[in-house]
Amino acid sequence: MIMVQGEVSGKKYTEPFSKGVLARSLTRAEMDPNRAYTFASRIEAHLKKNKVDLITIEELVEIVSEHLRKEDPEVAEKYMLWRKIRQCKEPLIILIGGASGVGTSSIAFEVANRLGIRNMISTDMIREVMRKIVSRELLPSIYESSYTAYQSLRIPPPPELDEVLIGFRDHVESVSIGVEAVIERALTEGISIVIEGVHIVPGFIREDLVNKENVAMFVLTVSDENVHKGRFYSRCRQMWARRPLKRYISYFWAIRRIHRYIENQARKHGVPVIENIDVVTTIDSIIKSLTKTTVKGGEKGAEKTE
């Protein structure tokens, strides 16, 4: 039996080599599952041929990378990027923001899956919890959608100000308290998590949190209004969808105004703005950005997979 040796908090451990675990890590680099398992079987055969009984994770990764570079350089690059992120000592907190309909939920799910992050939460869920705790009288804005929050304003703003954005900012300020609580808890517990939603707006989450090296924020945009509107038609035609298309279309003008505001906030605060047209391209952009700005290297304390 081939044993793989790793290290956790300075203590070494060994576990049996698993083709399934290795294959799963390869699928995170976008290798087809069947092909990944076949490749993992070849790695196992290679180790047996060389009569390897014990191998460190680092040595195994080097062998896998060498074989990948010969077979598929593109997958090899993605695999090494994934490995680099996995080696981060601290929990990884990824924040993905953007106006309704730009695809934050879909991208968050794919990014979490690619990185092997088990925890993901929508800011809409955080807002829903807050609704159960705080009454409508105290925080009327959170009982509205992000694009209708202006309707809850008790005092109408001056004509020269944009009431949609004033309502939206009030809405985001309230929900950001819940978002900050989730981030703080994840950091305390050492849990990696992806948080997505319209309430992830640069400038609204405490700087001491977003400036941490292991916290990364991204904003998604869709410049073409017709493409953006088409996303709502696509979303609402699903059988499980419960959100009425008519409501989105009726307030599309407000959604686009919020879209521009979030994008401007991102550029103002130096947050990466990603045009979300192609899912694969968007995910690759996020992964590459993480390796450049967030991951500083070093073995992750709880690393236990190939």
Swiss-Prot record:
Cofactor section: a divalent metal cation
Transmembrane stretches, start-end: none
Pathway field: Thermoadapter biosynthesis; cyclic 2,3-diphosphoglycerate biosynthesis; cyclic 2,3-diphosphoglycerate from 2-phospho-D-glycerate: step 1/2
Broad enzyme group: transferase
Enzyme Commission code: 2.7.2.16
Keyword vocabulary terms for this entry: ATP-binding, Kinase, Nucleotide-binding, Transferase
GO MF term list: ATP binding; kinase activity; phosphotransferase activity, carboxyl group as acceptor
Domain ATP-cone as annotated: residue spans: 1-90
Pfam families membership: ATP-cone (PF03477)
Top-level lineage group: Archaea
Catalytic activity, reaction form: (2R)-2-phosphoglycerate + ATP = (2R)-2,3-bisphosphoglycerate + ADP + H(+)
Family: Belongs to the 2-phosphoglycerate kinase family.
UniProt-listed PANTHER family: P-LOOP NTPASE DOMAIN-CONTAINING PROTEIN LPA1 HOMOLOG 1
Role: Catalyzes the phosphorylation of 2-phosphoglycerate to 2,3-diphosphoglycerate. Involved in the biosynthesis of cyclic 2,3-bisphosphoglycerate, a thermoprotectant.
Name used for this protein in its record: 2-phosphoglycerate kinase
UniProt source species: Methanothermobacter thermautotrophicus (strain ATCC 29096 / DSM 1053 / JCM 10044 / NBRC 100330 / Delta H) (Methanobacterium thermoautotrophicum)
